[in-house]
Amino acid sequence: MNEQVARKASDTVRPADVVTLAVRERFVSRGGWKLDHALQHFHIKVAGKAAIDLGASTGGFTDCLLQAGAVRVYAIDVGQGQLAWKLRQDPRVGVMERTNARHVTPRHFPEGALPVPLIVVDCSFISLRQILPSAISLLDRAGEIVALIKPQFEAGKAEADRGAGVISDPAVHERVIRELEQFATAELRLLWRGVTQSPLLGPAGNKEFLVHLEKTE
């Protein structure tokens, strides 16, 4: 209050006083809320599991997994220095920077780390078609994948450019999801467990979706 910490519930607040509330965010980034929604929607149990976060960036997905009870998360990102400090210092997090999710293989991981029962994906500027094949090689039999579908990176360049990078046509959303389902089930032999719309829009205002996939063999 008035740039001073109010420590007593009995402190008097006058009409001219300036009151500021300091709200601590639950996750280190908005991505945490997106994954949290998917985990609840698809009834995915995380507690006691090891997981991989492809496209970790600041670490919203990683943070969400840890808060849900993951015992180990390998945070993979092609960039460097983006992961939140609290996650970088967490002994449960394996920081794997400057690692392209498209080309990640079992040799990138320490002995005994693989396979894992759960992989989450939040990648930009690349289609999930180029990420999922690598993810499968890291996944346990009957393991699960939760991936964020970003239509602007799945649709054709002309469609994305037409909306200045924003895909607003529901028909394009439906087509993108349908084509991804066909790819995942027919070519990768994954089970398509379902899809749900993200509770938050992407940075540019794009609608995003989360898909739940399961490995069968």
What are these regions, as identified by a protein language model?
Residues 173-188:
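Short alpha-helix
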Residues 1-46:
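S4-like RNA-binding module at protein N-termini
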